Amino acid sequence: RSCVNSWNSPVFNLTGLTTLKLPFYASSILKLSSIENVCVSMPDLASTPRLIVGGGSNLVVLEPEFDGVVLRPEIQCFKPVQTGDDVYLEVGAGHSWHHTVMQTLNEGWFGLENLALIPGWMGAAPVQNIGAYGVELKDHCHRVKLYDFEEQAVIELAASELAFGYRHSILKESPDRFLVLTVTLKLSTRPQPRVEYGAIAEELQRQGLNASIPLDVAKAVMSIRQAKLPDPDETPNVGSFFKNPVVRTAVADRLKARFPEMPTYPDGEQTKILYLFVWYFRYGRCKTKYQYPSG
């Protein structure tokens, strides 16, 4: 919806594009439905302030007025190529992440089940290397197709070139340089569910689900997430997002000896991730609920 802002110029009300639904206005919006569309449009925007907005679950709007162009990567390709037990699936940046997870499971392509119900679009997934319940995007990312604003060209980077880390990638280091166009995932027709994460095993047992069936694992994950967070369509929120501390292995081991129930996870040879927030919330060490004023 167009209106007028403090710059005395036509703007678009984009409040509905973010899951927090905070006031958000931009001077223009450009919907990108294909790679060809990107190649034609982007050179003209080389010096224009721009903001990429996909599913809007990673965006907290602090300044309601953006004097620039909002880019909406709505590319919808879904191209599988099967090689033996492996399936290489190229997915457009505009696909819903959760819908992609469920579609792959229904097709019999496995690996993403632990990442069910993560909000947002496919294009954001490699930027911060999304992860949950013991699985990260890097475990199943084969390559990413990007538009490089510096080179003004479409390029491809293999997963090994993206420098994936804990909620990190080179795309996160250079947010103004790259626009994700498609992500190629490497999945398998042979299920290998990962249910070692305690909450999943407990939820599978509680519901009488089968730990060897990926779709059942996804159902358990969805139940866990739904119990923790409201539907953003009903109650605006940005989902469950936090980053646990990464410490040296020796420090993690000392803390583990003192607090045996505290979960840890290796992050390279010298460091471990401490799942402090999971531990606090799950074991009742942080039970207080806060209600912040909005508006």
Where does each model-flagged region fall?
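Phosphate/pyrophosphate- and phosphate-bearing ligand-binding catalytic cores of soluble enzymes
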Residues: 16-19, 154-295
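Anion-binding (especially nucleotide phosphate/pyrophosphate-binding) glycine-rich loop
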Residues: 3-150
